[in-house]
Amino acid sequence: MNRKITVPEAMLPRGVKDFLPNKAAKLEYLKQSLKDVFHRWAFRPIMPPTLEYLDVLERGLGAGLRDKTFRFDDRQNGKLVAFCPDITPQVARIVATRMKGAPLPQRLCYNGKVLRHTEQQAGKDREIIQSGVELIGLQGPEADAEMIAMAIECLQSLGATEFTVDIGQVEFFHGVMDGLNLPAPQALAVQQAIARKDASGLSELLSELSLDDRKYAEVMALPRLFGGREVLDRAADIVVNDRSRRALENLRQILAVLEAYGVEEHVTFDLGELRGLGYHTGVTFQGFLSGMGTAVCSGGRYDTLTARYGMDAPATGFAFNLLNLLMALDRTLESAAVQPFDVMILQSGPDKRAAQSLARALRDQGYACARDIIERSLQDSLDYGRKMHFRHVMVVADQAGDVRLIRLADGSEQTISLQAVLAGEFRL
């Protein structure tokens, strides 16, 4: 009988992954490191469900995420349910419907998986792991600056040094576009040209419109307004509309707070960044690590989201894509994420009670230990211990005897009293 050989990846739907122990340990390290930063900034955990009713969830989704939502019939009641493509709308719903009487602002953090439809191309994740925060009920530039400073501190806590946080402001774009009165197809074409930084294509589109020189200059400037803080001055020399100038003042105020936090060196500006136009209501930002073109985190202000669930409250936040973060930091996490275990305990012969008592005593003392239950040679056990990241091996003779302690790093040995270890009188 012929058996078909199956590649492990072919056993999974496209866009999802198994995470073996090494990668899983790194992901857990990333989660915990971010959680520690969130806690230092006084954010409390919240846990939304995996499934939502589609009609409820879609209130909080932009058009882009609606198209990426996995949906199916609930057999219990026939209603459409969905796997969430983003956690922020869930948090907005919970605060608006379950925490209406809670004091504001609410500082909430989360970690979870989301699912998104993607195009059929290799390497595109459909299952994404997010860790993020939402600051609900607080308006003003200091709140937005707090989000950016937190994101920077998260990256610093992971040992990253070469990274930037690119800041945009959707109100700046809206101010430039006000008054053009373009039909939807033309407006979309202009928006796409700006997002691509396609100055020649943008100029060609604008040539079909009857714009005065000042308005033409404002629109044409958008693909070029990116860089350091000097971008704000360049933009101020170009735009004359009040809406865009208010957006620039907002960015200056945010920058002043970031300078007080001492993190301004990581900040750049991109006033042609148009991500989330139908979702964000002010500042937006994305974090990029050196050498990686995909953002590891993104965030911004979304003052209208909770209102879609019945509670009008300003809000801002951000989320890390842990898979992108893992891809960027994989090599640097090797020593930090893979923590060794303390001791593996061996005992030959039919009576294993001494080894079992020793294992329990060591765990009670706070050590991470395991019994090597398989009967094999000492050398095979030592080889196994090294591969499984144990620091020591203990070889037990009998209930009353001594214990042979072997340090796997260098092979050095010493003999210690079993009773001393059981009594907690010996420390590894």
Swiss-Prot record:
Pathway: Amino-acid biosynthesis; L-histidine biosynthesis; L-histidine from 5-phospho-alpha-D-ribose 1-diphosphate: step 1/9. GO terms for molecular function: histidine-tRNA ligase activity. One of its GO terms (cellular component) is cytoplasm. SUPFAM superfamilies: Class II aaRS ABD-related, Class II aaRS and biotin synthetases. GO terms for biological process: histidyl-tRNA aminoacylation; L-histidine biosynthetic process. It is found in: Cytoplasm. Keywords: Amino-acid biosynthesis, Cytoplasm, Histidine biosynthesis. Belongs to the class-II aminoacyl-tRNA synthetase family. HisZ subfamily. This function is generally fulfilled by the C-terminal part of HisG, which is missing in some bacteria such as this one. Heteromultimer composed of HisG and HisZ subunits. Required for the first step of histidine biosynthesis. May allow the feedback regulation of ATP phosphoribosyltransferase activity by histidine. This is ATP phosphoribosyltransferase regulatory subunit. It comes from Syntrophotalea carbinolica (strain DSM 2380 / NBRC 103641 / GraBd1) (Pelobacter carbinolicus). The lineage of its organism: Bacteria, Pseudomonadati, Thermodesulfobacteriota, Desulfuromonadia, Desulfuromonadales.
